[in-house]
Amino acid sequence: MQEFTKFPTKTGRRSLSRSISQSSTDSYSSAASYTDSSDDEVSPREKQQTNSKGSSNFCVKNIKQAEFGRREIEIAEQDMSALISLRKRAQGEKPLAGAKIVGCTHITAQTAVLIETLCALGAQCRWSACNIYSTQNEVAAALAEAGVAVFAWKGESEDDFWWCIDRCVNMDGWQANMILDDGGDLTHWVYKKYPNVFKKIRGIVEESVTGVHRLYQLSKAGKLCVPAMNVNDSVTKQKFDNLYCCRESILDGLKRTTDVMFGGKQVVVCGYGEVGKGCCAALKALGAIVYITEIDPICALQACMDGFRVVKLNEVIRQVDVVITCTGNKNVVTREHLDRMKNSCIVCNMGHSNTEIDVTSLRTPELTWERVRSQVDHVIWPDGKRVVLLAEGRLLNLSCSTVPTFVLSITATTQALALIELYNAPEGRYKQDVYLLPKKMDEYVASLHLPSFDAHLTELTDDQAKYLGLNKNGPFKPNYYRY
């Protein structure tokens, strides 16, 4: 599928020596995770594991971590009250009864709450990870113990990554009819290896900008054969997950990996979309001097009005202390940029894919890689200069730290409703194209989360609703409204 190959996958290429390759895929858990290093050298694919019910329909690092993972999930549920509320409201009618959902997302305590919600609503689920470093091993174990067919562990190799996806899709006697994807790799694999599966698929729900790009490429080429829902560009994803989640998690990820002090540091953020805006706001608040690079004049003007200098990367690359990519594009930071960085410059990515930083160009004999701590590599030039590369250019927050549970509840609720909508839509409502969520659905997701803040909406009077030409119950904004 040529359309997919235009957007390289997040796993990238792994061409280092065996010793470095092993250190790059050690089964480190996230900073909040329980770890058991006794069997780190044994691949989960080589183990024979069963849960307490005797099932072996999973592949995780260590099923014995399930009890700890269950506690992590229960803690997440406390801050995901809206998703739990949706689960309770819809559990009786089972809107996903008969749904067979194959998913490829980050596997964390928060996504586990989503997966178990889908199961409670009647779906059967098979799940793999969309990022080789973001899986919380104990959470994957808890899902496996609960009967979910999950194939994921932290520190997968590239071969492991595709093997896990294949195990989810290719199972005798079970065929998916819905796809929930984050990055497009699952969709790509089905197109490439099992195109006949799409005869049964009712729809695709895609969360990330990378995956959405790939869907639009297919649609433009006339090769998208099922309806797809673009969750990434929904208001509830863009304005909450992308902005507020990144505003908090960028600092967490950088602190945990580098212990950097932000006051007075010069930072360049590539991209001033919602992710970039969140990162910049957090860095500025702690006293960092922040520069922006942008291709879009509207976003660039927003950055200027927010008090940031908009520059070309080449203008500041020699002086900055930190480089952060937030574009969803490829080769934003090239080998030329990396060669010109000053000693100890920190380089990381807050976009979905690992293609934003040209990490492949650093896999050369003249450069030495030194793993100094989990997800932190020093790339050393012949003259002794070091560049600090985080998570091998993959997503910083989920690879190196955690993300705010409440914000992920908003995204997870949106994903659940999108799956329900596509699965239950009458024939003909959605064609073979990419769709945004209906405005009413966005508003419903937001309304479910307001009680957490003890927030109370004002209600329109009949006269006010008539004056504005609105239904008193919404939607309250036209589709063209920009929040």
Curated annotation (Swiss-Prot):
Provide the GO MF annotations for this entry. enzyme regulator activity; identical protein binding; RNA binding
- What does the record's cofactor remark say about binding? Binds 1 NAD(+) per subunit.
Q: Where would you find this protein in the cell?
A: Endoplasmic reticulum; Cytoplasm, Cytosol; Apical cell membrane; Microsome
Entry comment on modification after translation? Phosphorylated at Ser/Thr residues between Ser-21 and Thr-25 in the PEST region: required for interaction with dATP-bound RRM1 and ITPR1. Phosphorylation at Ser-21 by PRKD1 and CAMK4 is required for further phosphorylations by CSNK1A1. Phosphorylation is induced by oxidative stress. Probably phosphorylated by CAMK2A; phosphorylation at Ser-21 may be required for interaction with SLC9A3. Dephosphorylated in response to apoptotic stress conditions which causes translocation of both AHCYL1 and BCL2L10 from mitochondria-associated endoplasmic reticulum membranes and promotes apoptosis.
Q: Which membrane topology term applies here?
A: Peripheral membrane protein
Gene3D superfamilies on file: Adenosylhomocysteinase-like, NAD(P)-binding Rossmann-like Domain
Q: Which residues of this UniProt protein bind NAD(+)?
A: 271-275, 294, 329, 350-352
Identify the stretch(es) annotated as PDZ-binding: 473-483
Region described as NAD binding: spans on this chain = 234-401
Ranges for the region named Disordered are 1-56
Q: Which domain of life is it from?
A: Eukaryota
| PROSITE patterns, sorted | ADOHCYASE_1 (PS00738), ADOHCYASE_2 (PS00739)
Q: Keywords on this record?
A: Cell membrane, Cytoplasm, Endoplasmic reticulum, Membrane, Microsome, NAD, One-carbon metabolism, Phosphoprotein, RNA-binding
Write down the InterPro entries for this protein, in alphabetical order.
Adenosylhomocyst_ase-like_sf (IPR042172), Adenosylhomocysteinase-like (IPR000043), Ado_hCys_hydrolase_NAD-bd (IPR015878), NAD(P)-bd_dom_sf (IPR036291), S-Ado-L-homoCys_hydrolase_CS (IPR020082)
Q: Where does substrate bind?
A: 108, 182, 207, 237, 241
CDD domains per the UniProt record, alphabetical:
SAHH
Tissue spec. comment = Expressed in kidney proximal tubules and outer medulla (at protein level).
Sequence segments annotated as region (Interaction with BCL2L10) = 91-154
Biased region (Low complexity) positions are 17-36
- GO CC annotation terms, alphabetical: apical plasma membrane; cytoplasm; cytosol; endoplasmic reticulum; intracellular membrane-bounded organelle; mitochondria-associated endoplasmic reticulum membrane contact site
Biological process per Gene Ontology, one example term: response to calcium ion
Please give the residue positions where the record annotates the modification Phosphoserine: 21, 24, 27, 30, 37, 344
Question: What cofactor(s) does the depicted protein rely on?
Answer: NAD(+)
Domain statement: The PEST region is essential for the interaction with ITPR1, and, when phosphorylated, is also the RRM1-binding region. The PDZ-binding region is required for maximal interaction with ITPR1 and is also responsible for the IP3-insensitive interaction with ITPR1.
Subunit annotation? Forms multimers. Forms heteromultimers with AHCYL2 (via the C-terminal region). Interacts (when phosphorylated) with ITPR1 (when not phosphorylated); the interaction suppresses inositol 1,4,5-trisphosphate binding to ITPR1. Interacts with BCL2L10; this strengthens the interaction of AHCYL1 with ITPR1. Interacts with CFTR and SLC26A6; the interactions take place once AHCYL1 is released from ITPR1 and increase CFTR and SLC26A6 activities. Interacts with RRM1; in a phosphorylation- and (dATP)-dependent manner.
Official protein name in the record: S-adenosylhomocysteine hydrolase-like protein 1
